[in-house]
Swiss-Prot record:
Triggers of expression: Conflicting data is available; found to be a member of the pezAT operon (upon ectopic expression in E.coli); in S.pneumoniae strain 0100993 is found in a monocistronic operon.
Function of the molecule: Antitoxin component of a type II toxin-antitoxin (TA) system. Upon expression in E.coli neutralizes the toxic effect of cognate toxin PezT. Represses transcription of its own operon, PezT acts as a corepressor, considerably increasing repression.
One Pfam family per UniProt: Epsilon_antitox
Keyword Phosphoprotein: no
Subunit structure: Probably a homodimer, forms a PezA(2)PezT(2) heterotetramer. The heterotetramer is much more stable than either of the proteins alone, and a specific mechanism may be necessary to liberate the toxin.
Keywords from the UniProt entry: DNA-binding, Repressor, Toxin-antitoxin system, Transcription, Transcription regulation
Protein name according to UniProt: Antitoxin PezA
Amino acid sequence: MIGKNIKSLRKTHDLTQLEFARIVGISRNSLSRYENGTSSVSTELIDIICQKFNVSYVDIVGEDKMLNPVEDYELTLKIEIVKERGANLLSRLYRYQDSQGISIDDESNPWILMSDDLSDLIHTNIYLVETFDEIERYSGYLDGIERMLEISEKRMVA
């Protein structure tokens, strides 16, 4: 779906693969793989495409959305807020893990599992959001992580 939307955006702007690739700073071969769906598109590249072509994340990652332009804008703003909040929480999680001497290789540790899950959320899953309910669910998830961190940080200080 993302590849098809990138290809559609490129064609809308009447650009060749080479021209589009140069604008977003990738090779033509990479663009071809993204458009054909043989390679996954990084969230960083989605960010660049959205900025260079003034489109929303939903335009790139979502198809057949049933939102009017105002709702689309509101959803895009909420996605940005949740993404930024998630990044801040992830930073706090990493600091907490460091302060507790938790090894990043310990995949059985719940703090590592939580940070991996949060990283997936802010780097991938957030771009697949198509409804306000989904973004609210992610926001609630962030609330839970924040509460756990606050409790753990207070115990650490006490």
